[in-house]
């Protein structure tokens, strides 16, 4: 009996000692499996676009969350008056990427601070903002702030270039332009149709100034770009950096270099809610990482996680539009998302040939910066955007 008891305790001691000695197995997080060889297919695409004279050159950056996977520049930054090679730190006219990056983000910061809410009427900030007038001569509902952000306010897309001097004269201010926009006939009742409108984002920049006393330039610098360390992102690039700016169109013998391409932003002195922002591929990658990190980058929080979610999902009241709050998800303008990224992916394009697309599911972002309008506004990047997005998406060998 004693032998059995002794044997029993020996077994217990052995088991206990083994438990003490055995350490838990440390499992390293699996690194993303990316086919770098597959990403190199982008080189052939860009070269073909340059041979077709669709673009003079390009900068491409692809990343996954906090890691840059691919970064390359191609061709020339300009062709006239003299060819000049593209460089990694070149500054591009982002055109309509201004809308989500500067304007919509600024509005959402104000929402978080309780200084505005999205269902407020536009006319509360822009007196005289005329509602839709139907065939019976009756005015409809008032447009709300969210209608401006989703391009469903009923505002027309633009003001024809040839009408700008006629409507505003030689001296244009944001105040008199917004007064003119407010009085324009609306194309539809708010929330009933989607018409991509630069005018709505000009109104949003006016609203930012009404609330804060700052232009969209001043507010976005102070609350977005400086905190993030995006030190080559700005409206109206400083004189000492204009040599790094990629030129756009040549208009009346003037090559627009460091001067915004968009006509309405240009007559507003380069500062507008619809266009005017300049940046680099590396600076835009910081912004993309901030969104993928749910509003935070390097310990600096710009937006709350819920704000990022609301901005980057199709807005519930106008699901037909395929638009979020400033961002594009599934609209006629979303070609830069390609065919493979999921339904939660979002982004935006710019008329000058720029685009940013982000996929929260795979944590991949795709930045394509070109100056396809240089020198004569004949280039095209619609197909190129989609193909690069498809290569980026299919380079991921293991879904995260």
Residue spans of the language-model regions?
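Short, surface-exposed loop or secondary-structure junction motifs
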Residues: 78, 133-344
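Bacterial Sec-dependent signal peptides at the C-terminal "C-region" and cleavage site
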Residues: 15-28
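Positively charged n-region of N-terminal signal peptides that target proteins for export
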Residues: 1-4
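Short, surface-exposed beta-strand/loop micro-motifs that present aromatic residues
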Residues: 345, 352-365
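Active-site SXXK
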Residues: 46, 60, 66, 93-119, ...
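Short, glycine/proline-biased beta-turn/loop segments that scaffold the active-site neighborhood
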Residues: 118-134, 226-228
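Bacterial N-terminal signal peptides
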Residues: 7-15
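Short, conserved catalytic-motif segment at the N-terminal edge
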Residues: 31-92, 115, 131-132, 182-183, ...
